[in-house]
């Protein structure tokens, strides 16, 4: 978010693109979770996975580095919550397709690295 450049939409951010991918894939696996989890882990993981990209987008729209950083930190918390739910789903073997949940856990780790890099970038911009 360089002040000298033209405005970039949040949908152009690589970290948002990855978080959107996570949200969509979580929505797909939720269809395969047992009914008894409908009001427990399904609601929780849908909410937390949606919150990642939503917080990145909201922070981006604030135009102040410190606010953007704070929303990215909230996104990071939601990302870890999503990862925790995925570990639970994996450990209970709710999803039978080999590697599908593991792939989402790896995607969470990839997003976290990107998000940490984006936060570091925003902190640097704030100092300049």
Predicted region positions:
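Amphipathic alpha-helical assembly/interaction segments
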Residues: 1-128
